[in-house]
Amino acid sequence: MLHVLQRKDMLSMTHEVYLASEEAKEFLNSSEKELLGYSYEWEGENVIHLHSHPLQHSFGLAKRCLFTSEAKISLSDFSEDIKYIATISQKNNKLDTKVYKLDGSDVVEISAKLIPGKDELYSRSKGLLEVEILSKKHVAIVGLGSFGSQIAIELAKAGVGIFSLFDFDRVELHNIGRHSCTLKDLGRLKTDAIEEAILGKNPYAQVNKYAINIATQKDVFCDVAKKVDLVICATDNNDSRFVIASALHKYQRIGIFGRAITRAAGGDVFRYKPGGPCYGCLIGSRILDSRDEEVSSEEAGRRSGAIPAYASAEDVNAIVQVGLSVDIEPICNLMLKLALLELSKGMQSGISSLEEDLKYDAYIWANRRDNNFSNWHPFYKSGPKQTILKWYGITIPKDEHCAICSEIPTLDTGLKLSHPMYSEYADVDFHLDDN
């Protein structure tokens, strides 16, 4: 006679099991009575995850498990490879799941928890975000470095359902200090690593991956851009930004651009809305100076031209000066707020009031009084004067000679232009738009 132990002391000694409710429902609705699945065990932590299919990027000790609709199990159902058996049924329109493990000659019932389905996973965000609507939104993210990787994961946590990821780089050691990826991701394509991170937060998301350079494969990007609801530009060079800006204008799509300056002393965010000033207008307005842009790596610097071919190792070290992860957080956060605001537009949500606050085309942030911001006023008792740790909004005029959006274009890359805001007289010459 089969002996099943269900004592509380035995339950506490055995593993805790997690099972995706969507996978359990899928099995229950199939015609199969049994299904060989996969168990992934965190050894030494008494935690396992059961899946009906193999994970693309597995973790822990992988074994097989058995899903069955039969309420009764026998010792013969277990084997050297099958360590766990899950019985799945439905009672009163609710899933009834029990998981068992063979312990010597005894079958022990294990405490099992169901991972919520798609409708429940982000229920705590309801009221603040329209999760059901966001699940149908399609966002393209170009550049999966410190900015893009974090933004992708946060949008997944918010419930965005469709992603198109663009980046041809791999995760390298110099990325780890600020990147969302970890040491275990070294050498992997960033598109693969961030796909895994997205699905780890939102297993119901659809992720499309493009390990390409959009500056040389514009057609591929444009084919995607015309289908999305929003584009996040988190690249580190103007070549790709102009490709994105042109596609946004051509297909009338919204875009959010963000960058940090040297050592992340500060940064800026620009939002393109169809009919408004584009990224070309922003460059032509002389607000940005690309010479001050942060160079995140030698490879990126050589691609963009920030590091010349003849540069010595000492020169390279002087040019490649990245900032702290904590210093890019405010810039990423505003990009995310603008993205969620645009994706939720027209819906009554908990962030709708931000539409009255975030009306500017561009925003500038300073983390500390270094480099371009050295003559800004100390935060302490700054009053109305320009200071650090505050967002400043700017209205950008449309450029009638813009190379991207005007009828009479004149190309201006803006590489040697700077706004008085970044000059030594920044606190005097720069005036915020009070309208």
Residue map of PLM features:
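Glycine-rich phosphate/adenylate-binding loop
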Residues: 1-110, 223-230, 234-435
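Non-catalytic propeptide/linker segments at domain boundaries
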Residues: 94-134, 154-155
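Generic beta-strand/beta-sheet core signal
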Residues: 142, 166-168, 210, 233-234, ...
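Short amphipathic alpha-helical segments
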Residues: 152-154, 177-178, 243-247
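A structured beta-alpha segment of the ubiquitous adenosine-cofactor-binding alpha/beta core
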Residues: 193-230, 235-238
